[in-house]
Amino acid sequence: MADPKIAERARAEGADQVASAIRHACEHLPAPERASEFGPFFDRFGDARVVLLGEATHGTADFYNARAAITRRLIEDHGFSIVVVEADWPDANRVDRYVRHRGPGAYDEECFARFPTWMWRNEEVREFVEWLRAHNEEIAPNKRVEFRGLDVYSLRGSIAEVLTYLDRVDPEAAKTARKRYGCLSPWQSEPAWYGRAVLHGEHDPCEDAVVAQLSEILAKRLQYSRKDGEDYLDAAQNARIVLAAEQYYRIMYRGSTESWNLRDRHMFNTLQHVMEARGSGAKAIVWAHNSHIGNAAATAMGWQGEFNIGELCKTAYGDEAALIGFGTDRGTVAAADDWNEPMQVMRVLPSRADSYERVFGQTGIARSLTDLRDPRQSEISELLAKPRLERAIGVVYRPDTEFYSHYFEAVLPEQFDAYVWFEETRAVTRSRRCGRMACRRPIRLASDRPPVRGGATSFIAAIQGSSETSFKYSASGQALAVRVCTLPIEPSASANLARLSPFAVSTKETRSF
């Protein structure tokens, strides 16, 4: 196995030359708070069907403000009508109702109530939401910009939304739906338990029941959509989420690759459904982590068999999909030190010498845009084509193990079409409207079994009895890092995984994005 120090020196080699070339070729950006000046730099992407805007962390104000400024420009000047974010659909739908003035809806403490609350309930998002509401007020209802959620984690909330909808439009169908979804009743509060129960033969899979429910809702599209097309779209999407979530929690024990791919496939399918519902010519903007919107084929993730929404968009739309990554060297970030732990404002360590962040940091430029698909920048793309490390901070940040927890190898000019650089960044500001996390009562379904009690701690205690399961999570980490918590990597597991890829450990340990 190669000496890590030799590999590190090889990646770091030539950084000064690359930084010098970037310094002369990149475009200096104003502060994103000056939206009218910042936004026009991104007019070059106005002809795309889909513009995907990334972030290197889930808690950096500069990234949120930059995405807001770019999004405003694309909406106002280039006809984009959909904003889709890495958030749960039911919460985003509440915001969508608010910004499109379509009945009960709000951006308040009821939105985005599950961990990590600060990711979408922060002042930067609130300001954008209020801008979008004001923008929509001035245009016809059928042309108003949508705000949608991409993610797969709203099992309980999506079940509740489907049942509420059917109670209103088809009470008999609601009774059937309750029986079908009753299969998932014991795990509504801790859905990760469901996968374990199926794995150990303690419960039959619920797949047939949730597939039947989705099929019935889709079969009644004409009947239901005549009453309210928007509400039907919402109910159908929630039924899709229940199916995807059932599959996700059932396969999460098989390893991180399969569950990651299912999640990002769901994100892509959601984007497709929203665009199709909007009609021909619809143009969308996606807000998600770099790890989702960059082309996974150009990263260690892809080299290990994973794909993401960015890669799927490139395959589907080609040059009509613009993947824009974001990076920073240092500053502060809103994050937790473990899953379901309180938010902290943490200091972001200066980047490693063998990372892309260090290359851009050596330019000495506070903010810049590097257009990697501009033919005039071919030299820059060639210089950046040597694989280097890239940092990814999710909702969990562990500075003490940053190399293993947050760095992965990538080829940046193949991963992104453009790269937005901030030398120093600051954490998001928790929204003044955010109260304590909502305590939701279990959904009443057709089942005699009580809901599973206990949180992540009891879940970990339950699985630690199985060395095989514990090893899977020790080695891959992703499933629990994403949904419940992160287990420490065992030394033996690290060694085994390192034989597969020198960066397998670093991409898996705390992948909370």
Model regions and ranges:
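Structured catalytic-domain cores with a bias toward divalent-metal coordination
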Residues: M1-R449
